[in-house]
Amino acid sequence: MFIDNVKLVLSSGNGGKGAVSFRREKHVPLGGPDGGDGGNGGDVYFICDNNTHTLAHFKGKKELKAQNGQPGLGRNKNGKRGESLELIVPQGTQVIDAQSGEVLLDMLVEGQKELFLKGGKGGLGNTHFKNSTNQRPDYAQSGVAGKTLSVRLELKLIADVGLVGFPNVGKSTLISVVSNARPEIANYEFTTLTPKLGMVEVDDYNSFVMADIPGIIEGASDGRGLGLEFLRHIERTSFLLFVLDPLRDMSLKEQFCILRKELEKFSSKLYTRNFGLMLSKSDSINLGEEFAQKMEDDYNELKAYLQSQNNPQSFFIKVSSLEKTGLKELKFMLLEEVKKIRNQNNL
């Protein structure tokens, strides 16, 4: 099950209580204090793991707590430290304060380990309180309480290329033929109900990650359809590929303008991201001469519009996933854009 948003109450462990104890030996009737310290409470850590792809393992868990420190013992034996709580999360997980909305942690790197909540310090045993005026202190410190915080874990998939389009335009088919992803494919809207990642291998030495998200509809940025819930997954994609469908009831230009508008309303950063355009189902030109002419007119209308906007796109290509035409060219075009962005990020 794909889960990308959970709420949790996290607590570090309480420090153990220091011991009040005195030496008990046969020939020492009034032995001095020998109370050990309480153990520190366990910490709470977040660990980034690429082998984990969802937050589903937190489903049904509302409160998670590290172990408390053990109390101190006699004979100057300290209590055992509480076991820390290590929370394994996928790459791209944000830890957000549930009240303020502040992003507290951003887990981006494989193996990244972050201390989130420090455990309470263990209390001192009565040994520490012996002095010249009090040789037998009968008190010790209580342990310090751990910390508690309500958080929201939010997963944003990290990919090089994000597919953007209306439902049932061919995004899932595309990612299934160019990558190792195997999404459900059917001829009805919202087949893709969860985001999918696929590795696209261009040749023996070059590859990139592609993300397919549920289709966006007009009003997605205002909460309509499934789009709003998953739009955040393309926030971390380096390059966007708009997938346009000649078989829809609206023109290619209308599709493009609505999709761009929804991205702009959701995030100004997404709106300014580099993008390419792909006309899917180009094999539908075989549906008849009249349709072929309409499709060509639509295509030329969008090209003219893009030209009037100073061609903001990196490329515009026709592809048929069914007939596998244009796929090789598309992969190399996308790789070129991904390489440009990677090089810029390394400067």
UniProtKB/Swiss-Prot annotation:
Top-level taxon: Bacteria
tRNA processing keyword on record: no
Required cofactor names: Mg(2+)
Annotated ranges, domain OBG-type G: 159-339
A biological-process GO annotation: ribosome biogenesis
Binding site for GTP: 165-172, 190-194, 212-215, 280-283, 320-322
Subcellular location: Cytoplasm
HAMAP family attached to this UniProt entry: GTPase_Obg
Function text: An essential GTPase which binds GTP, GDP and possibly (p)ppGpp with moderate affinity, with high nucleotide exchange rates and a fairly low GTP hydrolysis rate. Plays a role in control of the cell cycle, stress response, ribosome biogenesis and in those bacteria that undergo differentiation, in morphogenesis control.
Protein name: GTPase Obg
The organism of origin for this protein: Campylobacter lari (strain RM2100 / D67 / ATCC BAA-1060)
